[in-house]
């Protein structure tokens, strides 16, 4: 009997360590997870491949997707648009997959309106703003202006913590991963979001 999947939605500031934690999660639960590949209007960065890291599309194509309700969620981030396909997400859920989103607060709020009963939301951040700044400087991928903008965006997103189901302060990687892992395992077996009537019928037919 295959249970319905759910959406594990991750948000948090750039530099908080989301990608590192998600990589560890996929290493352990690869067969159960489906990573939602976003569509974006921004240009590919070095090493990024279309259809693997993102679906790179034009502004015109993205606008058509908005108009036709193609996206489960979409948002404008740093002058570019990002969005997640509703159809691909639903197909993965129907196949019992845990669909992983790594999206910002804007996208989370839109996705929640369309699929609230399927979403488990986790906000991942650093212990404080200074620690986040240190990590971003160490990463050395942003200009000073971009760095300040990321820090301001992080401050704005921190105001939305109460909207999320869980909060992980990513100060120690092992502890943070165990917390994320525990959230995933607990929600694999919850009754919320399942077709309980169908499950009961299948169970009775097996008598």
Swiss-Prot record:
It comes from Campylobacter jejuni subsp. jejuni serotype O:2 (strain ATCC 700819 / NCTC 11168). ATP binds at residues 12-19. Keywords: ATP-binding, Cytoplasm, Kinase, Nucleotide-binding, Transferase. This is Guanylate kinase. Its EC number is 2.7.4.8. The gene is gmk. The keyword Transferase applies. Essential for recycling GMP and indirectly, cGMP. The keyword Cytoplasm applies.
């Amino acid at each position: 009997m295959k249970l319905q999947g759910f959406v594990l939605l991750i948000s948090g500031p750039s530099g908080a360590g989301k990608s590192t934690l998600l990589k560890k999660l996929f290493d352990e639960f690869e067969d159960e997870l489906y990573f939602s590949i976003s569509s974006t209007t921004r240009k590919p960065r070095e090493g990024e491949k279309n259809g693997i890291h993102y679906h790179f599309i034009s502004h015109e194509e993205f606008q058509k997707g908005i108009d036709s309700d193609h996206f489960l969620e979409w948002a404008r981030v740093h002058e570019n648009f990002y969005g997640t396909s509703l159809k691909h997400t639903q197909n993965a859920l129907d196949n019992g997959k845990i669909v992983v989103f790594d999206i910002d607060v804007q996208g989370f709020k839109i996705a929640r309106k369309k699929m609230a009963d399927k979403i488990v939301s986790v906000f991942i951040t650093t212990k404080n703003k200074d620690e986040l700044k240190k990590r971003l400087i160490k990463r050395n991928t942003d200009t000073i202006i971009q760095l300040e903008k990321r820090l301001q965006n992080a401050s704005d997103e921190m105001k939305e913590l109460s909207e999320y189901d869980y909060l992980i302060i990513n100060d120690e990687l092992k502890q943070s991963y165990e917390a994320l892992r525990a959230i995933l395992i607990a929600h694999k077996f919850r009754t919320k979001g399942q077709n309980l009537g169908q499950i009961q019928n299948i169970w009775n037919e097996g008598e």
